[in-house]
Curated annotation (Swiss-Prot):
It is a lipid-anchor. The lineage of its organism: Viruses, Riboviria, Orthornavirae, Negarnaviricota, Polyploviricotina. This is RING finger protein Z. Residues 1-16 have a biased composition (Low complexity). Interacts with protein NP; this interaction probably directs the encapsidated genome to budding sites. Interacts (via RING domain) with polymerase L; this interaction inhibits viral transcription and replication, Z partially blocks the product exit tunnel for the releasing nascent RNA product. Interacts with the glycoprotein complex; this interaction plays a role in virion budding. Interacts with host eIF4E; this interaction results in eIF4E reduced affinity for its substrate, the 5'-m7 G cap structure. Plays a crucial role in virion assembly and budding. Expressed late in the virus life cycle, it acts as an inhibitor of viral transcription and RNA synthesis by interacting with the viral polymerase L. Presumably recruits the NP encapsidated genome to cellular membranes at budding sites via direct interaction with NP. Plays critical roles in the final steps of viral release by interacting with host TSG101, a member of the vacuolar protein-sorting pathway and using other cellular host proteins involved in vesicle formation pathway. The gene is Z. The keyword Metal-binding applies. A motif (PTAP/PSAP motif) lies at residues 90-93. It comes from the Viruses. Keywords: Host cell membrane, Host cytoplasm, Host membrane, Host-virus interaction, Lipoprotein, Membrane, Metal-binding, Myristate, Viral budding, Viral budding via the host ESCRT complexes, Viral release from host cell, Virion, Zinc, Zinc-finger. Residues 1-23 are annotated as: Disordered. GO terms for biological process: symbiont-mediated suppression of host cytoplasmic pattern recognition receptor signaling pathway via inhibition of RIG-I activity; viral budding from plasma membrane; viral budding via host ESCRT complex. One of its GO terms (molecular function) is RNA binding. A lipid is attached at G2 (N-myristoyl glycine).
Length: 95
């Protein structure tokens, strides 16, 4: 009756976050660490062509499958990377 409050639009803030692409770096070979090689945390098989998610790596196949379902990662529940930068890697040693 007289107690109705105007509803604010909470989706406006989520739309602004959704529109901005998440940028990540593409790696042809995994970085070696003290604890061994990095693998795709979803399928555990791929160790090449990895994409860095928030705190883990995903292969291109698993990333595409997750992006078809939603914008969130199934492992860490953060936004999946949508824009990938490929660094130029030398094909031969410098002379």
């Amino acid at each position: 009756m007289g107690n109705s409050k105007s509803k604010s639009n909470p989706s406006s803030s989520s739309e602004s976050q959704k529109g901005a692409p998440t940028v990540t770096e593409f790696r042809r070979t995994a970085i070696h660490s003290l604890y061994g090689r990095y693998n795709c945390k979803c399928c555990w098989f791929a160790d090449k062509n990895l994409i860095k998610c928030s705190d883990h790596y995903l292969c291109l196949r698993c990333l595409n499958v997750m992006l078809k379902n939603s914008d969130l990662c199934n492992i860490c529940w953060e936004q999946l990377p949508t824009c990938i930068t490929v660094p130029e890697e030398p094909s031969a040693p410098p002379e």
